[in-house]
Amino acid sequence: MPQEEVHDTSSVSDDNLTNTGGGGSNYYNSHNQPNVFVRAIRSIFGYRKTSLTLFVILTIIFTIALSLYDNNLDLTIELPTNKLENEILKSSWLDLQNIARYPHTYGSRANDRVHDYLESRIHDIIKENPYTEYNNDGEKVLYESAKSIVSYYESNNLLVRINGSDASLPALLLSAHYDSVPSSFGVTDDGMGIASLLGVLRFFAQNEQPRRTVIFNFNNDEEFGLYGAQAFVSHPWFKQIGFFLNLEGTGAGGKAILFRGTDYGIVKYFNKVRYPYATSIFQQGFNNHLIHSETDYKVYKEAGLRGLDLAFYKPRDIYHTAEDNIKNINLKSLWHMLSNSIDFANFVSNQKINDSGKDEFAVYTSFLGYFFSSPISALVTINSVLIVLFPILSGPLLFITVRYKKWKIGTSNFLSLPLAIVLTVAIVMIVVNQGFQIANPFLPSSHPLLLVATTTSISLLIYYVFLNGVNWVSPSGDQKLITIIEISFIYWLILIYVTHGLSQNKIGDDHTGEFPFTVLFFLEATASLFGLIGWTFSRSIKQSSNDGSDEPLLTGTAERYGSDDTDEDEQEEFRHHDGNTVKHLMQHFGYDWSLQYLLIVPISSLIIFNSGWLVLDGINKSIQESFAAENLIYLLIQLFSQFWILPILPFVYKLNRFIVFGLTIFAISGVALISFLDPFNQENPLKLRFIQKVDLNKSQDSFVEVYGRKGIFSDILSDMPSVKETHTKVECEALSDGLEACSYKSALAPNVIPGKSLKDYVNVEIVNSSKIESYGLLSGEIIITAPENRMCTLYFTKKKVKAVVIYNKSKSVNNFKSIPDGFSRDSKGNYIYKDVAGIDQLVLNKLDWNKNYHIGFDWLPNIDDEVNTLSVDVECYWADLAPGIGGGDNATNAELAIPAYNELVHYSPNWVTWANREKGLVSVSLKIEV
């Protein structure tokens, strides 16, 4: 049905519309009135303000209810009733409780305890199984982990292989990491992944032998370099693997989502899981580096495997904090990941996976338990057809309508929507960026939907006032259809951009998350075609006015039923328009508005809301990480609200006065709440990052350094008892991108090595200093002693070294020229890495708590150097909050290990959580000249 200026006669009295020429009597008399059922249908589906208001309210309820249901863990996941699965879940839950008893980072004794626990559990599960085998991966690797950064890692991954009946099939890898960060119990990251692996292992151990070999990698030290996965790449078992499923946690509970997949050929099999939950919107975010954290998926993909990344993704404000504990998760979260892992692994391990789609990115999503996926080539084809087809169909129809049906479209009618969009976007940008963002910048962390709802209300009011104003001054025959056509054109342009991007899709410029625009364009364009077809097959306005016909349509549009609460306004609008135009239009457009509304608004609203909510819910907490993230989130809030409004814009003229009043009240209330609500609370805390540093070049004094967003946490530090008692000043320094580092000299020295003075935490012995070799190279050799330590980093700040050596036992190393580029190992077992472009950082990770680091390096002095020495900054990290955990003679009170950290955790407000800044909670550094 055309816009309100077209006017369905259900809102106009009989004598206004159908007076006969002579006697002025009504066309219908009381004896010709339709029955109650027909009246009700006309009242509901007639183009009246009350009818539209009902539709809008139902649409909002439908959109929010379905989206909440689809994303709700408790409503969509059923706990198992099968006996075996129930036992597996109970066992995995107990495993999770044991794994997450203490923080268990790579640099902690609790990490060893978790390793030993897993080893014991694996042996219990696979014992007496003839086709399974266990291997404790002891690989040592030395490799370039980033540009000019070389990493050494000693692995203690736990590997299990379930040999398949068909050795010709490439194996399936299931992987998760068992280390946590120092500040977290690691329940979600990645305890649930490990517990799920144990559950899947038990499933296979108690069922028939699979066709395909399945390998489990319970890997270590993922958090600070993906080291466990990288070490496994060098293991002999890795060569037989073709596919993988990586289990991860970058949030803290909720539903496990399919983050990304290597290709369509493997992603499509996610439809075999019982509770699919997925969207390639997150894949696009990862591939375009909007999400900065990485998972082991990266290592496996770069090694040539095909697979999936299944992970928990929210909330990120308790991710890597002590709040990632067993109290804050749901048994159903574990079952969601575990059951989907069982289903996927069971299917892939017993089916032959072909190469179809292995070279194509996948576009995918899920809704209400159904999984949909497509190769991008198919989506490009569909989009291309739509881009070409709809102009071909709509162009002639529009020409016929304007040329022969006398549909007059004035300049003001044509420009009203573009001008309204420009005006609304401009006002909203000012309100949001200069108002909300300045008044309460971190509110998206706790109330993102309040910002979206308020912004949407303000935008709708602006559209309502502007578009109705233009329509009053310059009425159109069918402004609704004009608006639908113009929105279709907007989507058409967006679809061209999306299709071009998909046709050249690549990492760094990924468009796989933009698939919703295909559906949005199809719905809007189809509705525009219906409207144009209605005009095309109607009589022209001129014909209608000349034939003298007073006959109403069989639909009975001349009747008027329903409440009068809005009809007076509509009658006034009728009096404002030409009578013949109104009469003609109402005859030919009785109830098509409802068809157009139902075609466009409910589905479009649901797609936009659900997609927008998933994105916001996934990244809103990252507002605490940088100013760039803050700007991105506020931009997304505005885009979310503007796109959510688009489907309703063709009908905005008909909004009921009560809904307009409600929007006004809501907008005012929203602005007030945004101004006064606290951005952080116990459920949505502020996350701060901690490290305690000792620089032995200056003194044995320790300094607490805390990192967070600028200007919001210095008062918390100043309120610490030790700070107030010693009258210590908290000093803050602005960092880039809206961050701030605050520090203070701590009276609470670290005690991670009981009985040791801080000066004994790091000692460096220079074994060989500036020994001149051939080709003008200099070489040096040092031994680093760091008790109870697993992690150190060497920084070559002034000169890059050309080669590094991790000595095994012998000092004998081949001549520099004979050493191959990259990694090598000499006959004495020494690990060597050579890079003539230069190495400026060497990262060391070892398993033996008290073994020294024995390091050698070669460098080339600068021509203008007066002294041929190399400056080396040695920094070692300790991460153990409870060194006594795991046994040994070093048991101590956990509260005494890092008392400065414990003080902050204990005395901070309940709306603050704490995470580690570096790989440890304590670092001790020493600078030497070699």
From Swiss-Prot:
List the GO cellular component terms: vacuolar membrane
Gene Ontology molecular function: any one:
metal ion binding
Q: What is its EC number?
A: 3.4.-.-
Cell location: Vacuole membrane
Q: Mind telling me which residues the site (Transition state stabilizer) is annotated on? A: 319
Q: Which residues cross the membrane?
A: 50-70, 380-400, 412-432, 450-470, 481-501, 515-535, 599-619, 632-652, 658-678
Q: Where is this region: Disordered?
A: 1-28, 542-570
Under Gene3D superfamilies, the record lists: Zn peptidases
The membrane-topology field of this record reads: Multi-pass membrane protein
Q: Which CDD domains match?
A: M28_Fxna_like
- Cofactor: binding details: Binds 2 Zn(2+) ions per subunit.
**Keyword terms of this UniProt record:** Glycoprotein, Hydrolase, Membrane, Metal-binding, Metalloprotease, Protease, Transmembrane, Transmembrane helix, Vacuole, Zinc
GO biological process entries: proteolysis
Glycosylated residues, chain numbering: 163, 354, 620, 697, 768, 808, 890
Q: Which residues bind Zn(2+) 2?
A: 189, 223, 320
Question: Needs which cofactor?
Answer: Zn(2+)
List all topological domains (Vacuolar).
Answer: 71-379, 433-449, 502-514, 620-631, 679-930
Positions bound to Zn(2+) 1: 177, 189, 248
> Which sequence ranges are listed under topological domain Cytoplasmic?
1-49, 401-411, 471-480, 536-598, 653-657
Domain of life of the source: Eukaryota
Q: Per the annotation, which location comes first and is thus the protein's main one? A: membrane
* Residues at the catalytic site: 222 (proton acceptor)
Q: What does this protein do?
A: May be involved in vacuolar sorting and osmoregulation.
- What family, per the record? Belongs to the peptidase M28 family.
Record-given protein name: Vacuolar membrane protease
Which organism is this entry from? Candida dubliniensis (strain CD36 / ATCC MYA-646 / CBS 7987 / NCPF 3949 / NRRL Y-17841) (Yeast)
